């Protein structure tokens, strides 16, 4: 009962409230006015919210630089229409896709995007401009090659210096015992013994010795390989060569007779015969074998006459040549030594070259390029052969017949030279005469005094007449002698 009583009280309260509510709307017109005002206020509020909210622009870009602009807040796309749009999209998705409907759509240029914004271009950076180690491979190779060249230069130069010093230390005692002066560099007016080698460059060392009987002096030249040059090192890998020691002894004129003689390897003698002036003129025959004198097959002989060969090939000389044949390149004795042939652009030279009585030795250093300082000791016996050859050249003398034959050979060489150069000498004399005449004519033409100019012309004419008369007298004398 208590619950029922409570329920009745609630109904009474609710009924009183509803009656108070409907008392405000006594007639129908009041209700209409209330409704219109309420909806008008609602519409004003909606319009204010639409105008106050700014339009938001969304720009989307795809990979082909196409721009799409979407505007939010337009009247035709209100929030109330979203549900209808969703239903329409659902219907369109279910419909089949028609290719002809969108034909030419993608080919249309999008003018709105080009007006609003410039197209974005992506520049491809070349590979050689990128910051990576691959971009500097050429520089790396150049730096590596430069470092290799510098290292090879230092190592090769130091090795040649060590080899030269090892040779000098080995031969110094022998040289000082046979020569008063060892190691003159030529910088002082007076000859002084420096006791050291003179370095010409990184692979050539010189040593001058003098102060011995029967010779003016001895020049020793150590010709090492160009170990400081990387390209030369690479070339020697394909064709090995040896270091060489060249010794040139200049004899006194009264201490050596007139002859030309050479012994050495066949290849070296053929080359010397083509290059050297004296061997090509006085030893025209091919190199002959030295088996007759007990020489190995690797050595051959070039000689002006047989008497010279018999006199030079004594027991001790044969001993040196036989035991050290692998180190001997050539041995060259000559009283007509003038060096290599003189090659001129315009024919033969007009004058015979100056000659010196010379002993020339060329030795190969053991090792075929792979030389060590200890290998220089093997060349010491060859220096003893040089000292012996100096004394041998002083003692050796040709007999009467050999002397006459040698003189005939030298006269023949001189005559052949004069015949070869006769035309050239005539041309040179003719050019000198023409130059003299031209200078005389210029002097006459430059003379301002007419009387003096006339006298000079008459004097020149008289000289020409006298020359013609002399030529005619010579021709008459020749005819009389012929008769």
Curated annotation (Swiss-Prot):
Bias type Basic and acidic residues, positions: 105-118, 430-472
Basic residues: compositionally biased ranges: 473-483
Signal peptide (from-to): 1-20
Subcellular location field: Endoplasmic reticulum membrane; Rough endoplasmic reticulum membrane
Residues carrying sugar: 178
Residue intervals on the Cytoplasmic side: 21-135
Assigned keywords, A-Z: Chaperone, Coiled coil, Disease variant, Endoplasmic reticulum, Glycoprotein, Membrane, Signal, Transmembrane, Transmembrane helix
Family: Belongs to the CCDC47 family.
InterPro entries linked to this entry: CCDC47
Coiled-coil portions: 450-483
GO biological process, one term: ER overload response
Keyword Coiled coil in annotation: yes
Transferase among keywords: no
Membrane topology listed for this record: Single-pass type I membrane protein
Species of provenance: Homo sapiens (Human)
Free-text function comment from the UniProt entry: Component of the multi-pass translocon (MPT) complex that mediates insertion of multi-pass membrane proteins into the lipid bilayer of membranes. The MPT complex takes over after the SEC61 complex: following membrane insertion of the first few transmembrane segments of proteins by the SEC61 complex, the MPT complex occludes the lateral gate of the SEC61 complex to promote insertion of subsequent transmembrane regions.
Stretch list, region Disordered: 46-118, 424-483
Bias-annotated ranges (Acidic residues): 60-104
GO annotations of cellular component type: endoplasmic reticulum; endoplasmic reticulum membrane; membrane; multi-pass translocon complex; protein folding chaperone complex; rough endoplasmic reticulum membrane
Lumenal face residues: 156-483
GO molecular function, one term: RNA binding
Name this polypeptide is given: PAT complex subunit CCDC47
């Amino acid at each position: 009962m208590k619950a029922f009583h409570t329920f009745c009280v609630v109904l009474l309260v609710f009924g009183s409230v509803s009656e108070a509510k409907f008392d405000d709307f006594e007639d129908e017109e009041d209700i209409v006015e209330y409704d219109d005002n309420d909806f008008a206020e609602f519409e004003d509020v909606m319009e204010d919210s639409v105008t106050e909210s700014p339009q938001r622009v969304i720009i989307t870009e795809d990979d082909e630089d196409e721009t799409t602009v979407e505007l939010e807040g337009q009247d035709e796309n209100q929030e109330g229409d979203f549900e209808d749009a969703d239903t329409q999209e659902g219907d369109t998705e279910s419909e089949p896709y028609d290719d002809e409907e969108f034909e030419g759509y993608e080919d249309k240029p999008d003018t709105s995007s080009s007006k609003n914004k410039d197209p974005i271009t992506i520049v491809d950076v070349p590979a050689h401009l990128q910051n990576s180690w691959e971009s500097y491979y050429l520089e790396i190779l150049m730096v590596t090659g430069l470092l290799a060249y510098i290292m090879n230069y230092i190592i090769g130069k130091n090795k040649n210096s060590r080899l030269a010093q090892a040779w000098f230390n080995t031969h110094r005692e022998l040289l000082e015992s046979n020569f008063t002066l060892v190691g003159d560099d030529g910088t002082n007016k007076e000859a002084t013994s420096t006791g050291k080698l003179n370095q010409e460059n990184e692979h050539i060392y010189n040593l001058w010795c003098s102060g011995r009987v029967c010779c003016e002096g001895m020049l020793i030249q150590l010709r090492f390989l160009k170990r400081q040059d990387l390209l030369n090192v690479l070339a020697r890998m394909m064709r090995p060569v040896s270091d060489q020691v060249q010794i040139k002894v200049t004899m006194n004129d009264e201490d050596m007779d007139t002859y030309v003689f050479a012994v050495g390897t066949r290849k070296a003698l053929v080359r010397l015969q083509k290059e050297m002036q004296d061997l090509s003129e006085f030893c025209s025959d091919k190199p002959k074998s030295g088996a007759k004198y007990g020489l190995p097959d690797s050595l051959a002989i070039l000689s002006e006459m047989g008497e010279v060969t018999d006199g030079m090939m004594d027991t001790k000389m044969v001993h040196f040549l036989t035991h050290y044949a692998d180190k001997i390149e050539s041995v060259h004795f000559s009283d007509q030594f003038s060096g290599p042939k003189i090659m001129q652009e315009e024919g033969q030279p007009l004058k015979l070259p100056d000659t010196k009585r010379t002993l020339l030795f060329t030795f190969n250093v053991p090792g075929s390029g792979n030389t060590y300082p200890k290998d220089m000791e093997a060349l010491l016996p060859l220096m003893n052969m040089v000292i012996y050859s100096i004394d041998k050249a002083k003692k050796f003398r040709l007999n009467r017949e050999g002397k006459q034959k040698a003189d005939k050979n030298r006269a023949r060489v001189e005559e052949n030279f004069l015949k070869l150069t006769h035309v050239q000498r005539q041309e040179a004399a003719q050019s000198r005469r023409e130059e003299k005449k031209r200078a005389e004519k210029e002097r006459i033409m430059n003379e301002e005094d007419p009387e003096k100019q006339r006298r000079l012309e008459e004097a020149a004419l008289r000289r020409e007449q006298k020359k013609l008369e002399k030529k005619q007298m010579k021709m008459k004398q020749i005819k009389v002698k012929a008769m």
